[in-house]
């Protein structure tokens, strides 16, 4: 969804978006495990235009007819093809995502199932993303100043720390999912739900796009954990400095990419342009053993210190 408007604040309540009165006795969620919301339906939205397309979903700019708020409406197209447990877990996870409330995270406002299709309502505002900024600097043949790197990275760390403190992993941190407003505010979006899709459903899509941010534990199918988000943060910090992924290579196949990732084989960042602290943090995050990577509290602390230091020099 690079180059598309992001799902970001455009007014509206941080609580459920649709405020139509519920029944006198709301349905018991235990008896309806797939029921996310009983208050919204597609009839409550006027869809204006498509603003993005993901691997498994489409995103539309829409207006909620109940309060006239402009939102992003994400329709998960393959929800009906997911197995029953994946559906239930996905619904549960979205419930957790709706509880996140942080200035650097795109807010999940509401969600509902209609015609066997999952619909997610998100905050929206027009903005660019980090991948666009990286492409711009690359085209200009200029490096991103270190103070700018820390200005955005510290906000991203704040968002991830909020998620991790609530035991929620992002699972898909990459430049295209880091949106930047016109006033320089970072908004982390597209919180990863892809793991809920069944292997049969996703098999044909698993190699769509080169997974440059894939961690060694994912290559070995050892499962995703909080330290996998740290690996992705390290890759993103590196890419902001080098203007390309640490494991990028021309004409590289998936096997050679996996080899480079397992060996942490990437070109060093230029010492004459970036501080030792930045280069050190990258190497700590892009580390093969997840248990040896720092936690988000440490990464955020370093980012705060460096943001203050580079802003004052």
UniProtKB/Swiss-Prot annotation:
Name of protein: Serine/threonine-protein kinase Nek6
Active site: 172 (proton acceptor)
GO CC term (a single one): centriolar satellite
Subunit note: Interacts with NEK9, predominantly in mitosis. Interacts with KIF11 (via C-terminus). Interacts with APBB1 (via WW domain). Interacts with ANKRA2, ATF4, ARHGAP33, CDC42, CIR1, PRAM1, PTN, PRDX3, PIN1, RAD26L, RBBP6, RPS7, RPS6KB1, STAT3 and TRIP4.
Organism in which the protein naturally occurs: Sus scrofa (Pig)
Keywords: Apoptosis, ATP-binding, Cell cycle, Cell division, Chromosome partition, Cytoplasm, Cytoskeleton, Kinase, Magnesium, Metal-binding, Mitosis, Nucleotide-binding, Nucleus, Phosphoprotein, Serine/threonine-protein kinase, Transferase
Binding positions for ATP per the UniProt entry: 51-59, 74
UniProt-listed GO biological process terms: apoptotic process; cell division; chromosome segregation; protein autophosphorylation; protein phosphorylation; regulation of mitotic metaphase/anaphase transition
EC number: 2.7.11.34
Modified residues (Phosphothreonine): 202, 210
Subcellular location as annotated: Cytoplasm; Nucleus; Nucleus speckle; Cytoplasm, Cytoskeleton, Microtubule organizing center, Centrosome
Domain of life: Eukaryota
Name of the gene this protein is made from: NEK6
Catalysed reaction, written as an equation: L-seryl-[protein] + ATP = O-phospho-L-seryl-[protein] + ADP + H(+); L-threonyl-[protein] + ATP = O-phospho-L-threonyl-[protein] + ADP + H(+)
Activity regulation field: Binding to NEK9 stimulates its activity by releasing the autoinhibitory function of Tyr-108.
Record SUPFAM superfamilies: Protein kinase-like (PK-like)
Molecular function (Gene Ontology), one example: kinesin binding
Function of the molecule: Protein kinase which plays an important role in mitotic cell cycle progression. Required for chromosome segregation at metaphase-anaphase transition, robust mitotic spindle formation and cytokinesis. Phosphorylates ATF4, CIR1, PTN, RAD26L, RBBP6, RPS7, RPS6KB1, TRIP4, STAT3 and histones H1 and H3. Phosphorylates KIF11 to promote mitotic spindle formation. Involved in G2/M phase cell cycle arrest induced by DNA damage. Inhibition of activity results in apoptosis. May contribute to tumorigenesis by suppressing p53/TP53-induced cancer cell senescence.
Cofactor(s) the record lists: Mg(2+)
Protein family per UniProt: Belongs to the protein kinase superfamily. NEK Ser/Thr protein kinase family. NIMA subfamily.
Site entry: Autoinhibitory: 108
